[in-house]
Amino acid sequence: MEFSPLLQRATLIQRYKRFLADVITPDGRELTLHCPNTGAMTGCATRGDTVWYSTSDNTKRKYPHTWELTQSQSGAFICVNTLWANRLTKEAILNESISELSGYSSLKSEVKYGAERSRIDFMLQADSRPDCYIEVKSVTLAENEQGYFPDAVTERGQKHLRELMNVAAEGQRAVIFFAVLHSAITRFSPARHIDEKYAQLLSEAQQRGVEILAYKAEISAEGMALKKSLPVTL
């Protein structure tokens, strides 16, 4: 998926109030960007990092610029806009770039399901096959090439795992899909040191038939695409 129009570059001053970030452009202008990420953004928002941002043509927006990517001082590209995880996953499924999720004739988004009144990110369907329920998570936390999720305690994420276990118990296919949006990550594990309950539930989910997939995106200032399956260690 290509960025159109192309992203613009700036240098990060600070992220604050969760949804805002101040940057300096190459010509010395100071801008305030919308930050579309409610997470901790550990390692993704260091002062001096390069920020790549888009600009909306919607004149009613208070903050027309949106922070899309970080290019860390070590050179790693990180997608901080969490909306891209679902966009890239949908594109990869439709292009059949994810072999484990190929061969379906129908893709639906935001389908209501489950006892806890959730919405599944994607449901795949095909004749003579069980429905496939897919929950997508964005992975940007990295330590020594190891990717982790979550970057903060997530009761919502725990709920999604419980719902997927129920789906698998009903004979349908249940998949938790980790979209790795950090170019330095080479392998994935749950962040037990941050949310032990989530890590425990992920192991339980696998034992109960929930499939765990992790795919890494190729990221540049020109575009992104999910390309490579990564090893998962629980």
UniProtKB/Swiss-Prot annotation:
Pfam families: SfsA, SfsA_N. Transmembrane segments: none annotated. GO terms for molecular function: DNA binding. It comes from the Bacteria. InterPro entries: SfsA (IPR005224), SfsA_C (IPR040452), SfsA_N (IPR041465). Belongs to the SfsA family. Binds to DNA non-specifically. Could be a regulatory factor involved in maltose metabolism. This is Sugar fermentation stimulation protein A. It comes from Shigella boydii serotype 4 (strain Sb227). The gene is sfsA.
